[in-house]
Swiss-Prot record:
Keyword annotations of the record: RNA-binding, Transcription, Transcription antitermination, Transcription regulation
InterPro entries reported for this sequence: NusB-like_sf, NusB_fam, NusB_RsmB_TIM44
Keyword Lipid metabolism: no
Gene Ontology CC: cytosol
UniProt protein name: Transcription antitermination protein NusB
Record bears the keyword Electron transport: no
Family of this protein: Belongs to the NusB family.
One record GO biological process: DNA-templated transcription termination
Length: 137
């Protein structure tokens, strides 16, 4: 599994968690068995999802603070999951350069979401990065 595939799998599991309201770490192992994810390629996937679960409140607050005039309930659930993966990588996954995290989130949006979503996601993650660089998160 490539890092891109790991992100895709993380997005899928986070989407499921958001839809079910179940953020239990046990879901990771169940998802891996169901998806038949290779043990050698699972570390990056787990790093994203575990950081998401650990920091979910902060990630949600950061997204809310960077979506001007948007209530999170108005954001497509898939787009929200992509944003959560992107914010998680920018803030908590040190092995991923910030620009790569943003680009990969945009690519996920282009592949799996609506035509307008990728620019929306790019804008929000760009704002998150600017605040991080200015240390105002």
């Amino acid at each position: 599994m490539s890092r891109r595939q790991s992100r895709k799998s993380a997005m899928q599991l986070i989407y499921e968690m958001n839809m079910n309201g179940d953020y239990d770490k046990q879901r990771i192992e169940e998802f891996c068995k169901y998806q038949n994810i290779n043990k050698n390629d699972i570390e990056f996937f787990k790093e994203i999802v575990l950081n998401f679960i650990e920091h979910i409140d902060d990630i949600v607050n950061i997204i809310e603070n960077n979506t001007k005039q948007w209530n999170l309930d108005r954001i497509n659930k898939l787009d929200l999951s992509i944003l959560q993966v992107g914010v998680c990588e920018i803030l908590y996954v040190e092995s991923t350069p910030d620009s790569v995290a943003i680009n990969e989130a945009v690519e996920l949006a282009k592949e799996y979401s609506t035509e307008k979503s990728y620019s929306f996601i790019n804008g929000i993650l760009g704002s998150v990065l600017k605040r991080k660089e200015n240390a105002s998160l």
